[in-house]
Amino acid sequence: MTADKIYRYMLTVPSGLEEVALDELREVAVHLDRVNVEPGGRFGQIFFTYRRSPLQLLDLHSASHLAGLICEMHRVTVGQPGLKSICERVERIDLAAVQSLARAQPGEVDTGAFALSVTLQGRYRFSNAEVRHAVREILREKHGLREGSGSRLLRFHLQITGHRALLVLRLGEGNTGSSAVAYCLCRLLAMQRDARVLWARRDSDELSAIDELFRPRLLLGLLPEQRHGAKVQIGVVAIRGQLPLKAGLIDYVLGFAAGDPISELAELARILRFGGVAIMQVEHFDRYIGLMEEMDFPFVVLAVLGLQEQGRKYRLLILERLGEIDPELLQVGWDV
């Protein structure tokens, strides 16, 4: 950091998909330094130094939020002295550097107004409301800012996790969690435009993101039966198990293993074209892999990733549909 400049940034990305997000980041911003990936429970975070215009970073599809790192505090204690140390550090922030970073965004930003959000992850003897009240008062009284609303102002976020606190300035509009997840999954599949895609997961908001970002020729969404009646604005939507598909029709499948795995794998083998790729979110991984080996379905496992969602651990299994027998590859119902 030099005078009146912030060069340290933080990306908030889907948990378990941090490396996918980092791959997109390196593609967009080639001059990165001091990259640090911190996996998390619901979200992961990527910290990095970038000395060029942040405008290039605002269009990242894999991130829920992009923020400039204003200050980082360590050894934060759980009692009132910890809150006091946070407040003392906020008093010393370089407001000119914060305002300069905010003005680097496109459009007009009111750098005299602010909004503040706070998250606490851990057990403390001070509340979220106490932190917000104390920090807001400092921003008003010490730094001369006024409170406002909307997105065209200084959007401060204070994150307190364990014994560390981060004060950041959020930049850009960000993406919904659904959109970021959908992009990362499609990037893992190396999805091409004008493809035929089957989506059979749980968050139907992912469908709109896939349609907007990848423009498939066919986007078919199969909702779990408990989601019957859900409002979906894009693609063809049906209830899983009620819409037959032509064999070999689909190029890519994004699925959540929720039913009988043998039936699901058999249907996956039937509808995927030779060379087609599927990404399946699986909770009982060992059982799933065991059935693939036992039943000898025509798939090869390309990759396995860990994923945490709503407090539960899953694996993302990337499968390619084989077109011929290869004894060197793991295969999953294939008769010759």
Describe the residue ranges of each PLM region.
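A short glycine-rich, Lys/Arg-flanked "PGG" loop and its adjoining helix->strand segment in the class I
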Residues: I262-F274
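Non-catalytic nucleic-acid substrate-recognition regions in nucleic-acid-modifying enzymes
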Residues: T2-G148
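Core SAM-dependent methyltransferase catalytic element
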Residues: F47-Y50, G306-V336
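Conserved class I S-adenosyl-L-methionine
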Residues: R193-D205, A209, L220
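Conserved alpha-helix/loop element of class I SAM-dependent methyltransferases that forms part
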Residues: G177-R196
